[in-house]
A protein has these predicted regions:
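N-terminal intrinsically disordered, cationic/polar leader segments
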Residues: 2-66, 70-147, 151-179
């Protein structure tokens, strides 16, 4: 058994999981609706509020798919109940961010501000001028958007200036030594 795939998924109250004939899993909850196409080899069984995934054989591809789709369905259930968030910090003089509606404006040392529009289901928050919080119900979308924001100005190794994840450790380098 796949260590991850064999774990059952507990579906909380207020969340409905439906599987159609094409193996499209749809999860509805208080924070929205998410859908994921599951490989036809993987079968989903729901008994009460427990959801389990099963595979046809112990071949390597089936084991891999078993764990993958179990994790994806579990992330959908967590996403529609609690949601996901990624926090980014900006380090540098004059670096700041602000939110106006669904637009995030970042001043990060360029000659122009960088403006990012939030896609459907994603919200931005700025608790202070140097912190950005990306929230949403789709874990992959939140992570990709946070990575895109970080890629605007990655932390550099000499001074540590740039955009980094909250608990990310930046490996620092020593500068040149004089003669």
């Amino acid at each position: 058994m796949s260590r991850i795939g064999k774990l059952p998924i507990t579906v909380p109250a207020g969340v409905t999981v439906t599987v159609d004939e094409n193996n499209l899993v749809t999860v509805k909850g208080p924070k929205g609706t998410l859908s994921q196409q599951v490989n036809p080899d993987i079968t989903l069984k729901q008994e009460g509020n427990i959801l389990t995934l099963e595979r046809p054989s112990d071949s390597k591809p089936h084991k891999a798919m078993h764990g993958l789709y179990r994790a994806l369905v579990h992330n959908m259930v967590v996403g529609v109940t609690d949601g996901f968030s990624k926090t980014l910090e900006m380090v540098g003089t004059g670096y700041r961010a602000s939110v106006e509606g669904k637009k995030l404006t970042i001043n990060i040392g360029f000659s122009h501000p960088v403006i990012l529009e939030a896609p459907e289901g994603i919200t931005y928050e700025t608790p202070n001028q140097t912190t950005i919080v990306v929230k949403g119900s789709n874990k992959q979308q939140v992570g990709n958007l946070a990575a895109d924001i970080r890629a605007i100005r990655k932390p550099e190794p000499y001074l540590g200036k740039g955009i980094k994840y909250q608990n990310e450790h930046i490996r620092r380098k020593e500068g040149k030594t004089g003669k």
